[in-house]
């Protein structure tokens, strides 16, 4: 009887951990969010899109579940922030000359990428706002639409 109680307790305990954990967002999640953003801007226009990106309770912000931490960012082709889902203070700032801690011009890299192929993935280092602004590797999926570089990234 004692071993049955212990076994049941262990099973229940493992369920608590399983349901309490959330998986990190995936590259597929980030890419899907960019695709949703592109569909939204095509249907609603740039200004409504920018407002939705900046809205902390909008459809391009995930605060829980497996997509927790995902958000959209939008730049023009010269590195100016048009909308940012987390760092609203960046709006209007030109980040063309910003480098990551390794000296990589990541804005230039993703602009080159979207001009060559229309979309793709770039890896660089960036502050993670969901993890006390810790510098982490970040993979961002970016896509070009009407002079806008629309992206979403995941941290490693």
Report each predicted region and the residues it spans.
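N-terminal membrane-sensor/transducer module of prokaryotic signaling receptors
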Residues: 4, 18-156
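Bacterial N-terminal signal peptides
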Residues: 7-16
């Amino acid at each position: 009887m004692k071993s049955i109680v212990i076994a049941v307790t262990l099973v229940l305990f493992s369920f608590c951990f399983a349901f309490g954990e959330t998986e990190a967002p995936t590259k597929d999640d980030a890419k899907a969010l960019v695709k949703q953003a592109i569909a939204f801007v095509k249907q609603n226009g740039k200004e409504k899109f920018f407002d939705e990106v900046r809205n902390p309770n909008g459809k391009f912000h995930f605060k829980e579940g497996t997509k927790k931490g995902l958000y959209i960012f939008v730049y023009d082709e010269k590195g100016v922030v048009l909308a940012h889902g987390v760092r609203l203070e960046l709006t209007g700032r030109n980040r063309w000359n910003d480098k990551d801690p390794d000296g990589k011009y990541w804005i230039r890299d993703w602009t080159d990428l979207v001009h060559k192929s229309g979309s793709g993935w770039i890896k660089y280092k960036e502050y993670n706002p969901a993890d006390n602004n810790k510098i982490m590797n970040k993979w961002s999926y970016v896509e070009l639409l009407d002079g806008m570089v629309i992206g979403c990234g995941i941290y490693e």
